[in-house]
Amino acid sequence: MLSVNELALEIFDNLADLAEEFNAVYHELDNGARIVDCGVSTRGGYAAGRAFTEICMGGLGEVNFRMGQIKEFPQPFIDVNTDFPSIACLGAQKAGWTVKVGNYFAMGSGPARALSLKPKHTYEVIDYEDDYDCAVICLESDHLPNAEVMNKIAEECHVDVANTCAVVAPTSSIVGSIQVSGRCVETAIYKLNELGFDTRKIASAIGTAPIPPVRGAKRAMGVTNDATIYHGQIQLTMNAPEIKDYLEKIPSSKSKGYGKPFNDIFKEAGYDFYKIDTSLFSPAEVIINELSDGSVYRVGAVNTDVTLKSFGLQ
């Protein structure tokens, strides 16, 4: 069976060995845990953002960058593809682990989740878990984890703390913008899973989303989510004729809150994340190629006006 931690470790080791070339900083704690800072006390960049995103996908996704346009505005875009969408996106990339130890808080994602089985139901549904002896976690945080945090992660993953690795970046950073936009495919897989569709039937997935500008900590969560909600474009290839029953519920435009920048929606919800319609967290546009009869379906559309408003370009 494929090990997402083993595959991610290869990318992590390269990032750690060549940290300076990635504008990253490598740390080894007294307990042996290894950490690469991709944006907390260093600027990071596109190379670090690619490595962070590919680690987050358990080494089962490929990331590339290009320049595109939104209306007349040139914008960087991230392109993501995987031939193991269920494992890469739900089994690794999904931000399904809230890491809270003492005063430390981070959103945890990446292959270490497949060892800790967080959340367990996800791994039951996709029928996958890892048993590798090293854990690699991605932490979205403004602070680096200390030895106590890494000990807790190791304990939850049932590995020695010296075999525990973390890449860390704040949402409000170059790497933060890249890795959140790099979840564009994951949002489609996540949405279908939430709707009850068996995502193991998805053979391949490819997607693109603009990489938003870094607009400060207060705007970071909103602007990074808007990149996919209003401009994420995904194509899924699958052998599942029943997909036609799910089509209309997939795109973000079916959400009650759709049509405003995320930060406006968040403000209207009294800054209570749990009051936001979760169906909003979906890509803007999805193309599905169903292999059993060769059907091709399209749902949703990009919303350039809201994207540009969120990005500060209107």
From Swiss-Prot:
Keyword terms: Cytoplasm, Hydrolase, Methanogenesis, One-carbon metabolism
InterPro entries in the cross-refs: METHMP_CycHdrlase
Entry's Gene Ontology BP terms: methanogenesis, from carbon dioxide; one-carbon metabolic process
UniProt catalytic activity: 5,10-methenyl-5,6,7,8-tetrahydromethanopterin + H2O = N(5)-formyl-5,6,7,8-tetrahydromethanopterin + H(+)
EC number: 3.5.4.27
Assigned GO CC terms: cytoplasm
Function summary: Catalyzes the reversible interconversion of 5-formyl-H(4)MPT to methenyl-H(4)MPT(+).
Record family assignment: Belongs to the MCH family.
Protein name: Methenyltetrahydromethanopterin cyclohydrolase
Lineage start: Archaea, Methanobacteriati, Methanobacteriota, Stenosarchaea group, Methanomicrobia
Gene name linked to the record: mch
